[in-house]
């Protein structure tokens, strides 16, 4: 009898405690998943601290080749941010942020890469929305052009120049994430 009564008291307590632990764990895993990935955790911690830029591709090219590579790089970056979600998830924000930092390091022209990394230390990527990302990209592009004595890029009509995708995708993307995923799956045939 006494054992049965103890079980009656302990069992609800254990259930409540396990529920609280489950809630806490699910919230903490969503917010601080980077704790388990030190290579990702270290990137934001280094922002704005004057870290030394990494020059992966130090090869010197002639001006024409440099211009072609840098133009292609910026077309890619502008296309990526122009097609970025209006309301990105936390994962999408982290992915874009790390992509922009990594692409600055792997930029094919070493001189431009170093200057871009210095700018990113002062002005880290803004990934809260498509508008924030496109505005940030245009401003950073113009800052780099100014440092490298290149003409500034016009930010007018920026989104329209680089947007890709069907109108259905663009409309549903503004609504919510589940519809966006459904439309993406409908628009593409993955059968090969």
From Swiss-Prot:
Ranges per topology, Cytoplasmic: 1-8
Membrane topology summary: Single-pass type III membrane protein
Keywords of the record: Cytoplasm, Disulfide bond, Endoplasmic reticulum, FAD, Flavoprotein, Membrane, Nucleus, Oxidoreductase, Signal-anchor, Transmembrane, Transmembrane helix
UniProt-listed PROSITE patterns: ERV_ALR
One of the GO BP terms on file: protein refolding
Lumenal topology ranges: 30-192
An annotated Gene Ontology molecular function: flavin adenine dinucleotide binding
Pfam families given in the database record: Evr1_Alr (PF04777)
Membrane-crossing segments per the record: 9-29
Residues annotated for FAD binding in this entry: 74, 138, 141, 145, 162
EC numbers: 1.8.3.2
Cofactors that this protein relies on: FAD
Compartments in which it is found: Endoplasmic reticulum membrane; Cytoplasm; Nucleus
PANTHER family according to UniProt: ALR/ERV, FAD-LINKED SULFHYDRYL OXIDASE ERV2
Name of the protein: FAD-linked sulfhydryl oxidase erv2
Organism annotation: Schizosaccharomyces pombe (strain 972 / ATCC 24843) (Fission yeast)
